[in-house]
Amino acid sequence: LAASLCAPGIALAQVQYEIANPSGTVRNFDIANLGPVLDELGIQWQATDQNQDGVSEIRAVRDGIIFFIVPAACIGGTSGCVGAQTFALFSAASVSQQAINAFNASYAFVSTGPAPKGYYVSRYDIADFGIARGNVESSLDSFHALLDVAQAALAGGASTVSTLGYADDLASARLNEASGRALGVEVRVPASHAGAEHLREIEKMPELIRAFAGAAGDDAFNKIANIPGQ
């Protein structure tokens, strides 16, 4: 096998990272640890006011796309945050529920749902024992690549989906359960403290984003009309 991999004409793919020391460890998702990584990636960001849990959130812009990172599962109350909710909001007059279901069934890395004024695309990351710097970059790269896919799939849906009560309906519960399993968090069985915390964060994600979107100004939403071809 080794010989065949080294044979002439066969090249092993090399992942190129923008970040230095990609195998180095980010201890957790506290802003003090995550901020320098965002700086190194050239992502513009600022800490926002503390949320209801007393944790400051990050508002960031990359390639013209506004997104938010909310440290979660904070072992120290407002620090030692070993989870991170990353999401972007998009304005849309209507969005098809069929399109939402189809997208969520096709892409496990992110999930989407309706929000006031449009829809959201979100991702949850875990760093119980730290996370490689390169993995943070890869996660953000994948998240942003799928934002383009989501916009193409969800923009201009024919029927409007009401956001009222969506976070509590059966479809959302099934998606949260699937997301938990995809992250290695078994649902409805005894779990470690960290696993239980992550599951709680995943379950409350739609309601958290819905409330955030309802209170946010228009400047928090990305305008899909500006995307070429839309």
Indicate residue ranges for each PLM-predicted region.
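A short, solvent-exposed beta-edge/loop patch
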Residues: 17-18, 108-152
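Short, internal acidic amphipathic alpha-helical interface segments
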Residues: 20, 80-122, 154, 165-176
